[in-house]
Amino acid sequence: MTAILSQKVLRQMAFRWLAPSQSHHPLTIHTDTTDFFKIEYNDVVVLNSKPYLIRHNAREGRFGLDDEVKFWVKRAIDLKTGNLKIIKLVFYERFKTRIGGIEFECFRSPKKEARILDVVNGHSNFMHGYSIEDKEGNIVRVLDYIFGKSLHAYIGDLNMDHHTYFYNFFPDILRNFMKCIEAIRFLHQHAEKHGDIRRDHILIDRDSGRYRWIDFDFNYRHRENIYGYDLFGLGNVLIFLVGMGDVLLLDLKNQDHPALGELREEDVNIVFNNRVANLKKIYPYIPESLNRVLMHFSKGTNWFYENTTQLLDDLREFKMLV
């Protein structure tokens, strides 16, 4: 196939997504994705003879970072099927973080995410896709697009008092989140870890209603418990769900909340010290069996969960008692 014919065929395939003013202009074609800043809207990325029409860059969707562009993550159209995809290009970063005196070295690993996509193929609580190398050997991940909002956004959109939420909505949310914990256990049983567990990394699938994990490309090193960072992440999400959002010390102070005087240093989140983990002091109707679970992720804990089974067992005990 000549370059001219290739351009002609690609324009025919992309015609319905191109503006009339662009339908006769040559398309920029990329087979090397190393410099992802050069890959722009309406360009075509070709991977193993399969063309993808690039749409917008993805954006960070949490904690006021809605405008932070992720230039290495692109929305794209599979021009052979017309399906919407997410294309993740190779991007490396590395940092260290400390939780409760434990240091973790974190880094992005496209190879690790590619492995996990194979492991979780067909598992209903994970995103799906495949990896492929471009002509320069970059590991590109092509992901099925999940229609639906994040768990973070879903909780943030709820408009009710906490008591109503806790008794009428939280039980079903917890049931679904426990399936997410079971999914992380599945990963750990396969000697893999998620690496970046956050509430905006769970999408609620609009079609199935299932909670699905996304973004597995972070990895971390820690000598004592290789799954510890995942467990701290699960605890942060659980505290967020029980509280119907973050319970912040500053908000309590601004509200002159009566519980503020009862809070101690050991009652805050071990990772985020401006958030309350001991939620029973804020909402006294939270059962002690559930609050005990939360306190394992507090600054005052003297015992950390070592695996997801321990966490699931305690949550099941809470469910049996209510």
Where are these regions (language model features)?
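ATP-binding glycine-rich loop module of kinase domains
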Residues: 60-118
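A conserved short helix/loop substructure at the end of the activation segment
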Residues: 298-310
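Activation segment signature within eukaryotic-like protein kinase domains
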Residues: 176-177
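Juxta-kinase regulatory segment immediately upstream of eukaryotic protein kinase catalytic domains
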Residues: 2-64
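C-lobe/activation-segment region of protein kinase-like
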Residues: 211-293
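Conserved HxN/HPN-centered segment at the entrance to the catalytic loop
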Residues: 115-133
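Catalytic-loop of the protein kinase fold
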Residues: 184-204
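Conserved structural core of kinase catalytic domains
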Residues: 127-168
